[in-house]
Amino acid sequence: MQREFSKQVASAALDFFNSRQGKMLALVRALVETESASGDLEGSRAVVQLLAETAREIDGVTSVERIESPNYGEHLRVRAFTDAPESSGTVLLIGHTDTVHPRGSLQERPWRASDGRIYGPGIFDMKANCALAVEVIRALAALNLAPRHAVTLLLTCDEETGSATGRALVEAEARRAHSVLVLEPPAPGGRVKTARKGTGIFTIEAHGIAAHAGLEPEKGASAILEIARQIERLHAMNDPSRGITVNVGVVHGGTRSNVVPAEAEAEIDLRFSTAEDAKKLEAAILGARPFDERVKIKVRGGVNRPPLERTEKVAKLFELAREVAAQLDFELGETAVGGASDGNFAAALNVPVLDGLGIDGDGAHAIHEHIIVDDIARRGALLTGLIASL
């Protein structure tokens, strides 16, 4: 470690988060009960206001910015410890304030505590972790663990719908960063994510020739048949051994069963583990040619999130996190996952990224979404120790 995170300091960090747990959970509850589905402008701004007001109270915080996002609400950027001695880059904390749960979900599934768990729409992904990020900055100041690197917390408001306005902010801050820590939920068992697949979304349209299916089918050129052949070609690109999945999840076409269909389309989800595969697969999909020369095809879309690869830099960052966890008397695991996050954008800029650092729980995007209360202090102390050790 560059700075020793001793057992004594680890114990103090745990004590801090345990002592603050009630106040932190009050903030989490306020966030959960302020619904903020992607695109809910009022909800987004209200959530950001709660977090901004809390951040402004913390020693070490030098600026709190509410950044307008057209059609989505507001992003939040908090800068802290800007007088830190190390000039090689910031420690960037990334999260998001939007959820997949539409307004009204809270009425159906209100805040509920049961058996050491707290349930509520968006609590696991990831409103509890937004609150945790602010508490970690508070802990660094309160425990006199001012980090060597300035800290930037960036919470975007459109991650769940593809980061249309947040991506540029993430990339701009990542270019200034020494390390990026993503507070997305962990994998089962609290494992952090050292690799994430990249994603691509495509649509293939086929424009054929309509004809009567009984009287003169030979005059028709079936758009549905063309799409079916394209689907077989796409399916052949799957390679589980390399982490490549190509899924045609939606197909539309035709008008009536007795008409050779003139129009059809398919929607494609692409997942890949390396940037090299991303380029090849994107070119192969966009370069599709019709099997029937009478049919015209058009392909739209492309890669929208690069992969987070487990590079040597990522492995080194994970090893540091493991050392901090050991001082907290637990073993930190790692895994690779198929879903993407805003951390993928940072990883594409060759910055070390450690993802899945949020509070353990389950049920992201589901009706049983919850966090595990006993993991709050441990996760907060882990993040505090990791930032202090960089």
Feature locations, PLM:
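Short beta-strand segments
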Residues: 94-95, 154-156, 181-184, 205-207, ...
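Acidic/histidine-rich catalytic neighborhood of metal-dependent amide-processing enzymes
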Residues: 126-197
